Amino acid sequence: KECDWSSDVCSSDLIADYVKGIAVLAPLAQYMVVNVSSPNTPGLRDLQRKDRLAELLHAVIAARNSAGERRPPLLVKVAPDLDSTQISDIAEAALATGIDGLIATNTTIERPSSLQGVAKGEAGGLSGKPLFGLATRILSEFYKATSGKLPLIGVGGILSGADAYAKIKA
């Protein structure tokens, strides 16, 4: 079994769960996000692997397209804890499937050396200012990997107008 939205709830087929969610919610949504990046959900980040991601994206796009006249844009949200091969694989899957956009990034499992106090030893996703540099670098790498052909939304650690502008420039 794979675990889905919390460590207390497991599913034997995460892709089927996403498809059910898309089918039910698409007629009501302005846009939808396929989050494959929660560090707090065991096994979820495995859906970022190229083969699994392509399978998932094909399935949710088909579900969205079958949900009636309303076809909200579908975006996929990815983790910041990716190497260049993973970024390339995700970009390739996103472009090949025709997903509408990518959100970079969710929270990180990394703990920067500058982090102090209890947060330094906490498990789970780290957000806020410590995420800004990593998330912005990953956003820039996705822009290069997609040759600017895929709409990107940069999130993570934005605390000011200057931070927002840095994401735009990334």
What is the predicted function of each stretch?
Residues 7, 37-39, 77-81, 105-109, ...:
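Active-site beta-loop-alpha junctions enriched in small/polar residues
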Residues 18-26, 50-61, 87, 91-92, ...:
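Generic structural signal for well-ordered alpha-helices
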